[in-house]
Amino acid sequence: MKLSYQVSTYIIGTEFCVCVAYFGIGRNLAVYLKTELLEDSVTAAAQASMWQGTSFLTALIGAYVADSHWGNYLTIVIFTVIYFMGLVVLTLSTSLPFLKHSSFTSYLGLYMVALGAGATKPCMSAFGADQFDDADKTTAKGSFFSFYYLTITIGALLAGTVVVWIQDNYGWTIGFGLLTILIGLAFTNLLSGSKFYRCRKPVGSPFTRMCQVIVAANRKFNMDLPENEFLLCKATEKSEMRQGNEDLENTPEFSFLNKASIVSASDFTTAGALNPWRLCTTSQVEELKSILRLLPIWATFILFAAVSTQESTVFVEQGIFMNTRLGSLNIPPASLTTFDVLTVIVFTPLYDMIIIPIARQFTGKERGLSHLQRAGIGLFFSIIAMVSAALLEAKRLEVASEEGLVHKNVAVSMSILWQIPQHVLVGIGEVFNQIGMLAFFYDQAPDSTRSLCLALALLTISLGGYVTSIILTITNLVFGWIPDNLNQGHLDRFFWLVSGLCLLNLAVFVYFASRYKYKRSL
């Protein structure tokens, strides 16, 4: 047990450096694209959202190769090297005269970082948990995940304050150079624990098992399901076909897929071996059904991620046109995300200590709120956050008009500190939605698909970035709400539009959540 904790510190230390470097780029990326690559406001915000989306989309790549081919450790090593090389390219693009303002070099470095950082995300936490025995699941593993989450939060906090301040005051070369050194230290730290790690062999991808169910069901399209479900192929009958750790109860939903478990003579070769592309167990079929049931609810979490993405894109651009002085101190607009992180750090234990006991009195449930109820409350806070941003922008435009700055590309006298409420509201929403979402996916995913569900959770962040980019691009092309001079624009209308979409999204979530049928194990 003690050795497991010691080994996990190598992994937590590596993740800390990875998070500081990743958020150190992401928090200030829109500003970098405007000042170094001379992009306009909409393009910079859209490209920053696209980059953040891609960095989480690549989590699927990491999850696939780790499960199917390389295992978690080798996947982390290889993609950390790519991460490091991307930072080297990015640093050179800001330091070498002939590469300055080179979009190709800058984006090459940025997307190498997106690939390296994203692909390690679903592997790092799983690899840390692998260091503990199964008997430690409820104690040691729980402590590891708590420290792991805290590490990510502290890393984001340092990135949004110290790293952003260095970039704004000492330049991009020094800022990116320090992040490059940090990832080099992370890689060295990871390798230094190599002889102690417990590495599990890859057991095959859940994608393959799901494809087998679809193919087998299609091959038996014209066959009738037996009235007695016990005539279907069960994992307990053929232990060599057991792909996961859990026997799931056969369900009537998506009944077409149940045909994959109909036993027929053509399912066996002449040597008597089973063909997994012709016959699947009922538990294997239920694995796919479990994922399909999650998808409608999963889709509603994408818009929440889109709201979170705006903290480092549109919120930053709004802040640029506000007074960033606090006495003799100049506040970088990107550093306001610190209030989101601080809210998460403070509100997470408050949720356990205060909200759960109060909710328990009303619901009678041990955990107070169900995972879906918790996630739904987070979606509600996304609406309030956007309303707050819209009201603030409307007031900022009013001040710009009063001060005669509508046609001047300068900041108004209104303090940037007025952005704090919208960042705090997003942070509260994350405590409810993001943690509720992860707990829900972990609880409802079959044992053999939990890594896939972790990747799906990360994918919502990716798609949220793309959604923000699409909304920004379309609204500006159609309405022109977000010009380079925001004093002449109507960013408030953009925020109102997103508020309306969030309200519609909450209604869709309530509809599917109220009809969701929970997984039942045998």
What are these regions (language model features)?
Residues 1-522:
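Hydrophobic transmembrane alpha-helices of multi-pass solute transporters/permeases
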